[in-house]
UniProtKB/Swiss-Prot annotation:
Its EC number is 2.8.1.13. The active site is at residues 115, 212. This is tRNA-specific 2-thiouridylase MnmA. Residues 162-164 are annotated as: Interaction with tRNA. The record marks 140, 355 as: Interaction with tRNA. Disulfide bonds join 115-212. PANTHER family: MITOCHONDRIAL TRNA-SPECIFIC 2-THIOURIDYLASE 1 (PTHR11933:SF5), TRNA 5-METHYLAMINOMETHYL-2-THIOURIDYLATE -METHYLTRANSFERASE (PTHR11933). GO terms for cellular component: cytoplasm.
């Protein structure tokens, strides 16, 4: 039998209600099974986030029609109540509209962060409270542990390849008190083994891959429908001012992109900046991608001292500027205009406005999440065209 994780709750299980956010996948289904088998008063909730009829033919997308059916079948197997909540309008406003607006303005969004910050945690926690639940549990791969001062902290997952802490940096300290992530200390193989032990019909269901509301990964289709100006063609301009060609619309490009530029040059060129107001995509050599400092906005801080103190002390941190990158050493500071900034010990490439700059206390596999913010601006290591020529 597979070892069971610590469910980390207070009180008698039978009198403790736990709402489990059930996407219809194996991870959240196992979470529901863990709490149900331990004797908790479990209520399964699945969010209808968009017109699932349009997406029902697709595999690999969260909460499409098949996923809602799968979640209900898991709940039936476990003998727990299950509700489907229509969150479509708030999901469109908080996630899809922001996603399209970001691409139209030349920045690269992370819709999963917006969804976790708003629909899944802010709104679903409120719904859990209305249902009389003490906790909301999800199938995210991130660890939540009690801190010495009684608060809770977030840590990278035991299985590094599955770690989702980057996407959960905006989770607030208050939310952490009521959130539980039992899979953070587990490995995926053990989760699937538990699904089989519990007799769950989704034990062999493939993992989701795409952004849930993007058919087949074609995000441009979504953006163009909502913000057609993002598909307007414009100039591809070298950092030295030369116009090298035409682009297909700013929504097709992101910082660090090399493929798909459609221009022939003797040296490889990369997207360095996107000026949506001028409908320009600016390109240059790889050396121009290296960034030494980042300013951030909408900061969520989970550290032990106030964020203002951490800035004043220029606290050492480790940062991830993309979910697939390892944490790198940096320190906090204030930019000349007073906004929070992160100074990198070594230049990082592909730092894109709109993406997340996520802070940790070290670079290890068990690092604690200290928070993060949205990237506003990036200061390149090379200050002039001559330096990268």
């Amino acid at each position: 039998m597979t070892d069971l994780p610590l469910l980390d709750t207070d009180g008698d299980p039978a009198s403790t209600r736990v709402v489990v956010a059930m996407s219809g996948g194996v991870d959240s289904s196992v979470v529901a099974g863990l709490y149900a088998r331990a004797g908790y008063d479990v209520v399964g909730v699945t969010l209808q986030l968009y017109d699932h009829g349009e997406a029902a033919h697709r595999r690999g997308a969260c909460c499409a029609g098949q996923d809602i059916y799968d979640a209900s079948e898991v709940a039936r197997t476990l003998g727990i109540p299950h509700y489907v909540l229509d969150y479509e309008s708030r999901f469109k406003e908080e996630v899809i509209d922001r996603f399209a607006a970001s691409y139209a303005s030349g920045v690269t969004p992370i819709p999963c962060v917006d969804c976790n910050r708003t629909v899944k945690f802010r709104d679903l926690l409120a719904t859990a409270e209305e249902l009389g639940a003490r906790y909301l549990a999800t199938g995210h791969y991130v660890a939540s542990r009690a801190l010495p001062d009684g608060r809770r902290g977030l840590y990278r997952a035991a299985e590094e390849a599955r770690d989702q802490s980057y996407f959960l940096y905006a989770t607030t300290a208050a939310q952490l008190e009521r959130l539980r992530f039992p899979l953070g200390e587990m490995r995926k193989a053990d989760v699937r083994a538990l699904a089989a032990e519990f007799g769950l019909p989704v034990a062999d269901k493939p993992d989701s891959q795409d952004i849930c509301f993007v058919p087949g990964g074609d995000y441009a289709q979504v953006v163009q429908r909502l913000r057609p100006e993002a598909a307007e063609p414009g100039d591809i301009v070298h950092l030295d001012g030369r116009v090298l060609g035409r682009h297909r619309g700013v929504m097709h490009y992101t910082i660090g992109q090399r493929k798909g530029l459609g221009i022939a040059t003797p040296e490889p060129l990369y997207v360095i900046a996107i000026d949506a107001a001028r409908q320009q995509v600016r390109v240059g050599p790889r050396a121009a991608l290296s960034v030494s400092a980042i300013t951030i906005d909408d900061v969520n801080w989970l550290g032990d001292i106030p964020f203002t103190d951490a800035l004043a002390r220029q606290a050492d941190v480790y940062v991830k500027v993309r979910s697939t990158r390892p944490p790198v050493p940096a320190h906090l500071a204030r930019a000349t205009d007073g906004t929070p900034a992160v100074h990198l010990a070594v230049g990082e490439e592909g730092v894109a406005p709109g993406q997340a700059c996520v802070l940790y206390d070290d670079a290890g596999a068990a690092a604690r999440l200290l928070g993060g913010g949205t990237i506003m601006r990036a200061e390149r290591v090379a200050k002039s065209v001559a330096e990268v020529a």
